[in-house]
């Protein structure tokens, strides 16, 4: 089995922990991101999704587990945020990413999806498409991109859904894609549902590594209960 085939096999039917703290938060340091990653692996995660060069370098020093690397940018002339430039591809590879993920949506972009894929492939890394719909995913699949993520489903529209897009997972899996289900998988039951729907692996982020979000969910539920009690009287 080749190294790349072995890497693919490691992720199959597994949990990928996305260790991306809220930007500027108390947890947003490379050392803490690396600690999060190690804790996730200790809990059974088979891979990691890490944003930013310094974070990837810190995680790579701490573990040899598979890393999906991304760089997020806010561009003035494009809504594409995830790994938009060719230079990002080179930097991610040099930092230690095993898999390079990039936006494949049909939006105005500084570099074509095909060019990003070719550059990532030239580094020797595996590739992952962050798709928003079936058309994005199939285009990426036909290019030869190794993994198709549902990462951006619901995030290219005005109102973001609350539930994950299991239908897209099924569509892509039936088309022969290695699907990494991602986006709003906030419970073990939803992660299991993604595997049942045909996902190759499942990425979970906020529900594992964003304490602010998790606490917010609990607080909102408590407040809702309090409101309901008050209306009873």
Swiss-Prot record:
Q: What's its EC?
A: 5.1.3.9
* Pathway listed: Amino-sugar metabolism; N-acetylneuraminate degradation; D-fructose 6-phosphate from N-acetylneuraminate: step 3/5
Q: Do the record's keywords include Lipid biosynthesis?
A: no
Q: Provide the GO biological process annotations.
A: carbohydrate metabolic process; N-acetylmannosamine catabolic process; N-acetylneuraminate catabolic process
Top-level lineage group? Bacteria
GO MF terms held by the record: N-acylglucosamine-6-phosphate 2-epimerase activity
Output the PANTHER family linked to this UniProt entry: N-ACETYLMANNOSAMINE-6-PHOSPHATE 2-EPIMERASE-RELATED
Q: What is this protein called?
A: Putative N-acetylmannosamine-6-phosphate 2-epimerase
Record lineage: Bacteria, Pseudomonadati, Pseudomonadota, Gammaproteobacteria, Enterobacterales
């Amino acid at each position: 089995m080749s190294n790349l085939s072995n890497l693919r096999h490691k992720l199959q039917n597994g949990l990928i922990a996305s260790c991306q703290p809220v930007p500027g938060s108390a947890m947003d340091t490379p050392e803490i991101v690396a600690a999060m990653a190690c804790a996730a692996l200790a809990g059974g995660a088979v891979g990691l999704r890490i944003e930013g060069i310094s974070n990837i370098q810190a995680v790579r020093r701490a573990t040899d587990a598979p890393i999906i690397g991304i760089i997020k940018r806010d561009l003035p002339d494009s809504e594409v945020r995830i790994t938009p430039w060719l230079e990002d591809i080179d930097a991610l590879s040099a930092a230690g990413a095993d898999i390079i993920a990039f936006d494949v949506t049909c939006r105005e972009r500084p570099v074509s999806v095909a060019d990003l894929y070719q550059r990532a492939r030239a580094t020797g890394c595996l590739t992952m498409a962050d798709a928003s719909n079936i058309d994005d995913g199939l285009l990426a699949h036909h290019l030869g991109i190794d993994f198709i993520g549902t990462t951006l489903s619901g995030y290219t529209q005005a109102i973001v859904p609350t539930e994950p897009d299991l239908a897209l997972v099924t569509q892509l899996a039936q088309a022969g894609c290695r699907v990494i289900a991602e986006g709003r998988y906030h419970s073990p039951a939803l992660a299991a549902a993604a595997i049942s729907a045909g996902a190759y692996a499942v990425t979970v982020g906020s529900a594992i590594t964003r304490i602010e979000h998790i606490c917010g969910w609990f607080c909102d539920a408590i407040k809702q209960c309090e409101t309901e009690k008050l209306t009873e009287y």
